[in-house]
Design a protein with these regions (language model features):
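Aromatic- and acidic-residue-enriched carbohydrate-binding clefts of CAZyme catalytic domains
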Residues: 7, 11, 46, 56-58, ...
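An active-site-proximal structural segment forming one wall of the substrate-binding cleft
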Residues: 68-75, 112-150, 173-188
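Short, well-ordered coil/turn segments that N-cap beta-strands
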Residues: 8-12, 39-41, 73-79, 141-146
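Boundary/entry segment of secreted carbohydrate-active catalytic domains
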Residues: 3-24
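Aromatic-lined substrate-binding rim segments of carbohydrate-active enzymes
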Residues: 29-37, 44-107
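Active-site-proximal loop/turn and secondary-structure-junction residues that shape catalytic pockets
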Residues: 18-20, 49, 85-87, 152-154
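Conserved small/polar residues in nucleotide/adenosyl-binding loops
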Residues: 221-223
């Protein structure tokens, strides 16, 4: 990928989700006409398109996205291409349930909504790497590509064992030892001092959730 973005125009556009309308090509055709009429010159594609790009594991369908890239380019527009990890496909949750998010009550979520995944899951990370690699290889040098949109919003904390271990690892790097952590969080209050790193759990309505330092650190790492 050697192309650089030098468009001097004011970028005008927004998120566009043609993957939701693939059964209605007449709608997609009208969309392009409306964009030109409104002088839209930039669209973000693929934010929640993972299931349209990889409908089953390892089977990729890029034809529809090829057409959108070419159509946007033909009208003189730019594409901001999103990595689609904000909304994983159903098959991923079904085959690899560890990718589903665990809430602060320790309950494993089922598939649904968005940002409902475990960021720490090795399987989730590998599947994200695979789809992102495919997108980069296919569209990295397309003349319409202006920039990348990484995933989506920050949300969907997970409290599974993977995330709790990452939480403790992060705290060990920050505080070095339990004595420093106990002091920073003032864990002598109510007699809750830690004596082992395995005792350090993230805030939970079922346990500790009134320690301000703990809450602040959780917001900093955002597990």
């Amino acid at each position: 990928m050697t192309n650089y973005f030098f468009d001097q125009r004011f970028l005008h556009g927004g998120d566009y989700n043609p993957d939701q309308w693939l059964d209605y090509p007449e709608i997609l055709k009208k969309d392009l006409a409306y964009m030109q009429k409104a002088h839209v010159n930039t669209v973000t594609l693929g934010v929640f398109a993972w299931s349209a790009l990889e409908p089953t594991e390892g089977v990729y369908q890029f034809d529809w996205l090829d057409e959108q890239f070419d159509a946007i380019h033909a009208m003189g527009g730019n594409v901001i291409l999103a990595t689609p990890s904000g909304g994983r496909p159903q098959w991923l949750s079904q085959k690899y349930p560890e990718v589903n998010r665990t809430n602060a009550y320790g309950q494993k979520h089922t598939h649904g909504f968005r940002h409902n995944h475990c960021y720490s899951s090795p399987i989730y990370r590998e599947k994200v790497r695979q789809i992102n690699t495919k997108l980069a290889e296919r569209y990295g040098d397309h003349p319409a590509l202006a920039m990348w949109h990484m995933s989506n919003e920050y949300s969907g904390e997970c409290f599974c064992e993977y995330c709790q271990e990452n939480w403790r690892d992060w705290l060990k790097k920050k505080y070095k030892n339990l004595e420093a952590l106990n002091h920073a969080w003032w864990m002598s209050f109510w007699g809750n001092r830690y004596s082992d790193w395995e005792q350090v759990l993230p805030p939970s309505p079922l346990g500790e959730h009134k320690v301000h330092g703990m809450d602040l650190d959780l917001s900093l790492i955002h597990i």
